[in-house]
Amino acid sequence: MFKLKSIYEERPWLKLYPSGVNANVTFPNKSVGEVFDDTTEKWKNRTAIIFYGNKISFKELREMVDRFATALAALGIRKGDRVALLLLNSPEYIISFYAVVKIGAVVTPISPVYVSSEIKHQLEDSGAESII
């Protein structure tokens, strides 16, 4: 006979949620690039990034991302291409990440603190055609 599973059997982590936390989150049927555009439009005059005391607004961030996405496309990076990001945690990483996803390419994050053999393995395993 068919036995219904409790929500906690299917998703046991929900037992750990404090009461009042919504366990059912809905997401828009949009790409990450579209969500980025919506967010940057909504909060365009607010600060998106503070890095070493320098502030970048959401509007400025979107402009930088769009310029870099255009440059990547001009270099021949296309939808489905894998692009490795070998960058420190910086505004450049954020700009690169969103530029890559906006043109439909796939981000392969690689930590620059890895030793060379780890970086080599990740590059080969991911099939990245380009690296930033």
Predicted features by range, described:
Residues 114-132:
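Conserved ATP-dependent adenylate/AMP-binding module captured primarily in the ANL superfamily
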Residues 104:
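Structured binding elements
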Residues 1-30:
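Flexible, non-catalytic linker and terminal segments flanking ANL/adenylate-forming cores
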